[in-house]
Amino acid sequence: MIPPEIRRSVLLQKAIKLALAGTLLTFASFSATAADPSSDTETPQPPDILLGPLFNDVQNAKLLPDQKTFADAIPNSDPLMILADYRMQRNQSGFDLRHFVDVNFTLPKAGEKYVPPAGQSLREHIDGLWPVLTRSTKNVKKWDSLLPLPESYVVPGGRFREIYYWDSYFTMLGLAESGHWDKVADMVANFGYEIDAWGHIPNGNRTYYLSRSQPPFFAFMVELLAQHEGDDALKEYLPQLQKEYAYWMEGVETLQPGQQNQRVVKLEDGSVLNRYWDDRDTPRPESWVEDIATAKSNPNRPATEIYRDLRSAAASGWDFSSRWMDNPQQLSTIRTTTIVPVDLNALLYQLEKTLARASAAAGDRAKASQYDALANARQKAIEMHLWNNKEGWYADYDLQNNKIRDQLTAAALFPLYVNAAAKDRAAKVAAAAQAHQLQPGGLATTSVKSGQQWDAPNGWAPLQWVAAEGLQNYGQDDVAMEVTWRFLTNVQHTYDREKKLVEKYDVSSTGTGGGGGEYPLQDGFGWTNGVTLKMLDLICPQEKPCDSVPSTRPASLSATPTKTPSAATQ
């Protein structure tokens, strides 16, 4: 067996070109990009491209329990050299792939398990977690898949060692409740930096996330910061808000009715809406083996089509859900790119309204009017195409079958959350949510039991917050209180037993973490922490805040959202 300390001879150096024949590898100077996002550097490549057959072989060998581990591994030397070594060694007698990985890569270490002090209340526990979940990329190594950011940031926790786009807004809500406005400002600055550097906010700050984004919450983040800094925040981030919008709307000017391009859809009547899209159509590096197996299970579809739809579902944040599938029991029937999601379009309505407000703050009334017109057009398209009149709730539009889908999901609350719903329709959505989705432990994501994590019986903190705030926007305070109280009780009961907050909860009862999906239940957990703090302040009066969930349900919510209603709610 070749010893670990391989002497790269002149022969090896000459062999590199031959060993790498046909492999296209592109590198970027992370340090230069971090210092200047406008610097002319190439986009860094993900590990499946950098390492080619080595990456494929390691993942397929299942050397590590979690496929994300090797995607996050740091090469100890130039990947070109490592790959050349691998091509020369792999067919030799006694070659040990695991030993080769251990010698040539630094694997991510498991974080130290946080043991909270005994007797902490729920609020004290969350406040104590913020520094534990804070990370910095000041010491990012060359060839790391981690993308550097200028400021520190708060990660979700567990296997999620990097920042995530839509998670972060709900985390930031909690940071603001804890008085950490400096951290809120840092995280907004990081996302603004990413928009300048990459043209969009990636799924997370990893090279393998650059080909997609996530639910566009940047406008909400800037609006949150503006609560503390005033209109200065809106004016400061107006250029990045405009770039974010340009990313989502790229190609719209060339579309004819009935056509789609990347993230933009033009329906037959000329209405413009959006969908989720990933620029790549290969297995996800962080779920390599699982994606290959999913594609193989449905030989009637091109594998690249399935890969794109899996990736696009990851862009939606709902990875995975019956919402995207023809057969909820068969993941390979996923077709995310043929579905126009109601929540995405509600969020883009909010982005357009925020752009109008920011433009007005900057003194550009003409631009403000243009963005208001775009928001109004989208609102009409949502009411026309994303409302299921037969069922009485907002739903997704099916491009493949040219009709509204019937499935009720927690996404139906998003038009209420952004004040884009008509009053009578908001009342119908509230009734549907109460009748079909409200469970003992909170709001169910869907009513379908598929084994996927964004289905029954799971409930997720961000969707509870969207529902509670959206319902309050339309005076549906009783249903909002039920969602808030039941979810908080679930969080409190789980914390009482396990002394932790988790990524998702089983809402069919109280006191149980959720299941399903591609990985074990994670704790920490950024967005649960943030929503829990916000909800604690909803159920307890400001003059007498509570540190844990009270033993008896309050008669009413103590606070209401501060958003300015749109014309639809007036």
Swiss-Prot record:
One annotated GO biological process: trehalose catabolic process
Cited InterPro entries: 6-hairpin_glycosidase_sf, 6hp_glycosidase-like_sf, Glyco_hydro_37, Glyco_hydro_37_CS, Trehalase_periplasmic
Source domain of life: Bacteria
Compartment(s) where it occurs, according to its Swiss-Prot or TrEMBL record: Periplasm
Bias (Low complexity) ranges: 554-570
Keyword Signal tagged: yes
Cross-referenced SUPFAM superfamilies: Six-hairpin glycosidases
Residues the record lists as binding substrate: 159, 166-167, 203, 212-214, 284-286, 317, 518
Entry GO MF terms: alpha,alpha-trehalase activity
Keyword terms, alphabetized: Glycosidase, Hydrolase, Periplasm, Signal
Annotated active site: 319 (proton donor/acceptor), 503 (proton donor/acceptor)
EC number: 3.2.1.28
Signal peptide extent: 1-34
Catalytic activity from the UniProt record: alpha,alpha-trehalose + H2O = alpha-D-glucose + beta-D-glucose
Family matches, as Gene3D superfamilies: 1.50.10.10
UniProt-annotated stretches for the region Disordered: 544-570
Keyword Ion transport belongs to the record: no
Principal place of residence: periplasm
UniProt GO cellular component terms: periplasmic space
Oligomer and partners: Monomer.
Described purpose of this protein according to its UniProt entry: Provides the cells with the ability to utilize trehalose at high osmolarity by splitting it into glucose molecules that can subsequently be taken up by the phosphotransferase-mediated uptake system.
Family listed: Belongs to the glycosyl hydrolase 37 family.
NCBIfam families for the chain: PRK13270.1 (NF009773), PRK13271.1 (NF009774)
Name of the featured protein: Periplasmic trehalase
Biological classification of the source: Bacteria, Pseudomonadati, Pseudomonadota, Gammaproteobacteria, Enterobacterales
